[in-house]
Curated annotation (Swiss-Prot):
Major site of localization recorded for this protein: membrane
Membrane topology: Multi-pass membrane protein
Family: Belongs to the CbiQ family.
Bilayer-crossing regions: 26-46, 66-86, 231-251, 276-296, 317-337, 369-389
GO terms for cellular component: plasma membrane
Cell compartments where the protein resides: Cell membrane
Keywords per UniProt: Cell membrane, Membrane, Transmembrane, Transmembrane helix
Coiled coil region boundaries: none
Listed Pfam families: CbiQ (PF02361)
Keyword Protease among record annotations: no
Protein name stated in the entry: Uncharacterized protein MG181
Domain of life, source organism: Bacteria
Length: 420
């Protein structure tokens, strides 16, 4: 990638002026957030933040486009995998509707009156159930959530059979009124967007011991079904990698190898108390980062030189390409060892000794800008982690309302003849 080949890019920007240790701490906090399951919405906020930092650092836009191009193939590969592994779009039940069901614990679905959505990952999971013993009139329908005891249910043939059973319970309600009330309450379901998947109906289960009816929605899927969930999952994972690439680009493009070595050494300073050679470790990392651009540039030169001699790296079978690759690997290894030897000789000539204490020519001071940046990022980090632990973020991928299609219409449910 171009940013690695060019390495450090001097600019007069806010990001360049930050203390090296400050940039490393912010980088580590963002990496932690990327690997924490914070949900698609919060991760998108982090992505926008990293993009904002990238451009206020005054880095060339081609670096940004290069990073996106480099993960396009990964996105397509993940989309292909998710196409066949996540063919189930699932159903949604909104928190507003959950709040109308008195027996549900709404604490995990709402936080500070934020409207959230509960994603039913498996369409063969129960959405809600109701007790027929409380069905004395249309105003006393007692709906509530029932968790993981579907094995005890006995199949009922369909919605009409369910309405007939309730009407024969001696409650004085006709089948049509019960069916009408049932349909009204079951318009709480949303079907996630998909191509080739259609709502097919409910399997209605009855437990004679507890007098509970469980409603399980199911779908009719075409062979080519592609769900929006599969697309989001592919983008979700790709976005994680893109965030790390972009911020690594910002870190290496706004900090020289000397600054990175200084920042790493200061960040790992407590390890000196247990006799770990932090300065050697920091110097090793700084040298490795410094030589990545050089080696990539050398590899490009070798590829061009070999191509000018008629060597084809793109065409041919697998074995042919592997033999051609040796023409790149062997010179690269030779160049790497040669550079390492020259660097070691140069450092010895300048009197470098890893066991000796070294002074620093450049003095980096913590300013109020560093303190403010650390405070804001750390506060943001704590809030996101807190909301994640509380379960107050959008569940699973954090699917917002615009990903939902309309309610399953009444006529579709009314016309169903579902067999158990």
């Amino acid at each position: 990638m171009d940013n690695f080949i060019n390495g450090y890019i001097p600019r007069n920007s806010f990001v360049h002026k930050l203390h090296p240790t400050t940039k490393l701490v912010i980088f580590l906090l963002l990496v932690i957030l990327v690997f924490v399951p914070i949900g698609f919405v919060f991760q998108s906020v982090i992505f926008l933040f990293v993009t904002f930092v990238f451009f206020i650092a005054k880095l060339p836009g081609r670096f940004y486009s290069s990073a996106i191009k480099s993960i396009t193939l990964l996105f397509l590969l993940l989309l292909f995998v998710n196409w066949f592994t996540f063919r189930d779009p699932g159903f949604y039940l909104t928190s507003d509707q959950l709040n109308s069901l008195p027996a549900i614990d709404n604490s995990k679905f709402s936080f500070w009156n934020i409207s959230l959505f509960n994603y039913q990952d498996n369409v063969f999971s129960q959405v809600f159930a109701f007790n027929r013993g409380n069905l004395t009139n249309l105003n006393q329908l007692d709906f509530f959530y029932k968790a993981n005891n579907a094995d005890s249910y006995t199949k009922v043939k369909g919605i009409d059979s369910l309405a007939s059973m309730l009407a024969n319970n001696g409650n004085g309600l006709s089948k049509d009124k019960i069916l009408s009330a049932f349909l009204d309450h079951n318009l709480n379901l949303y079907l996630a967007r998909s191509w080739g998947a259609n709502f097919a109906g409910f399997v209605v289960d009855f437990n004679p011991t507890t007098q509970l009816f469980k409603l399980t929605p199911f779908l009719a899927n075409a062979s080519y079904v592609l769900t929006l969930r599969a697309v989001i999952l592919a983008f979700y994972v790709t976005q994680k990698i893109l965030i790390m690439i972009l911020f690594a680009t910002v870190l290496t493009s706004t900090s020289s190898s000397v600054e990175l070595a200084y920042g790493i050494e200061r960040l790992l300073w407590p390890l000196k108390l247990i006799k770990i050679p932090v300065n050697v470790f920091a110097m090793t990392i700084a040298i490795a980062i410094r030589f990545v651009p050089s080696l990539l540039l050398e590899s490009q030169r070798i590829l061009n030189a070999q191509a000018s001699r008629g060597l084809d790296f793109r065409n041919g079978g697998f074995l042919v390409k592997m033999r051609s690759l040796s023409s790149l690997v062997v010179p690269m290894v030779s160049i790497a060892f040669r550079n390492a030897s020259e660097l070691a000789s140069a450092m010895e000539a300048r009197g470098y000794h890893p066991a000796k204490k070294r002074s620093s020519y450049r003095q980096y001071k913590i300013t109020w800008i560093d303190i403010l940046a650390l405070f804001l990022v750390f506060a943001w980090f704590v809030v996101i982690i807190f909301l994640t632990i509380r379960g107050a973020v959008f569940l699973d991928l954090g699917t917002p309302e615009w990903l939902l299609t309309g309610k399953i219409n009444e006529q579709v449910i009314r016309d169903l003849k579902v067999s158990g």
